[in-house]
Structure formats: structure tokens, C-alpha cells
Amino acid sequence: MKTIITKNLILIALVAFVFNVQATEKNEMQNAMNLTPNIEEGKKTYELCATCHNADGWGKTDGSFPVIAGQHRSVIIKQLADIRARNRENPTMYPFTGDDVIGGAQGLEDVAEYISQLPANPSPGKGNGLHLEEGKKLFNEKCMACHGSEGMGNAEAFFPKIQGQHYEYLLRQLQWIRDGRRKNANPAMLALIKEMDDKTLAIIADYVSRIPAAK
């Protein structure tokens, strides 16, 4: 009887902990969104980010580090908050997202605003280009409703800009979302791609990587 009670108490404690982490993350994100950014402070913080994402925010064409330049401020804030709340698995980023590095909500706002104003990458890494018509069809059917016809996303809905992103990074994230490795993935997106094989995801990623920049 005592064992059952103990297990139940542990379970309750774990559930309470998870909800507390999620609430903290949400509060931090909302607080950051309501602050006035300090671009100069954001630029200083970004010097550390540039180690991997480069000074221009264009990452690496092999997809090991994504393009972040020009991404919506809201999306950047959410992803950073998710990563440091461990709601998105990214061990490489963990050391760079702590309060001691970025700061609190104000730090998130500052660096996110700075990154959002960097010019977008005009030439991201691309796939083989063999199935672009099929990729366009799939994109229009599965992706356009949220990400827009030009892949520009929706800042208010936290839908990321995907135009100008590296093919290899896009493909990896699609696979991770499908396979349940992205804990912070949008459930609606998971439902759309959960039955897709790697080839289909690659075709979509290749098309997206080639969407021309909006004029």
C-alpha cells in the first residue's frame, strides 16, 4: 500500500514539475514579447551566437547550423525559450541559452530582434532538384496554409519563415517532427507529415529551399 502511495506521489510531483516548467516558459516568452528591444545589447549577445550561425546568421549550407537571419522575432523567442526549458531537445544550444549567457526575458527580446533584422540568406543549401514539380504540389497541399505561398510563415501564430532555409536542415527537422523528436512541434504539422517517408520529405525540403525571396 505504501509503495502504491509513494509511486502516486512521485507521479503527481513529476506532473506538477512539468506544468511548472511549461508555465515558466510561457510566461518568459510572453514577457519577452511585450518588452522594448535594445538592438545594441542584442548585437553584443549575438557575438556568441555567431560562433556557429556566423556573423550574417546564414548558418552552414550542409544544414549543421540553420539560417536564422530574418526569422520572425516571435519565432526566435519561442524557440530559445523552448530550448532552455528543455521543451526542444538541442544539447548544442543548451550552454548558450541560459540566463547567464542571454539573460532573462529582456535578453531574449534583444537578441531575437537583432537576428530578425539581419538580411536573409539569398543562396541556401539545396537538394538535387529532381522532383520540384512534385515538391511544389506537396507544399501547396500540406504546407502553404500555415507557411504561406512564399514560405514566409506567420509571426503572430509562431509559424516560422522557411524560405531561404538550408535543404539539409529542413529535411532533418521534418524527419524529427515526424519521428517525435521535436517535443515542441505543432501537432497539426505532425498530423500532416506523420505518414510521409524520407523521400517525400526530401522532395518537400528541396522545393522549399528553392523558393525565391519575396520582393
Regions found by a protein language model. Name each.
Residues M1-I10:
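Bacterial N-terminal signal peptides that target proteins for export
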Residues G42, C49-A55, V111, K142-S149, ...:
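The canonical Cys-X-X-Cys-His
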Residues A32, I39, W58-R88, Y94-D99, ...:
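Gly/Gly-Pro-rich "capping" loops immediately C-terminal to redox-active cysteine motifs
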Residues A23-Y46, G59-S64, E113-L138:
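Electrostatic cytochrome c docking/interface patches
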Residues T61-V67, I83-D110, I115-L118, S123-G127, ...:
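Axial heme c-ligation environment in periplasmic c-type cytochrome domains
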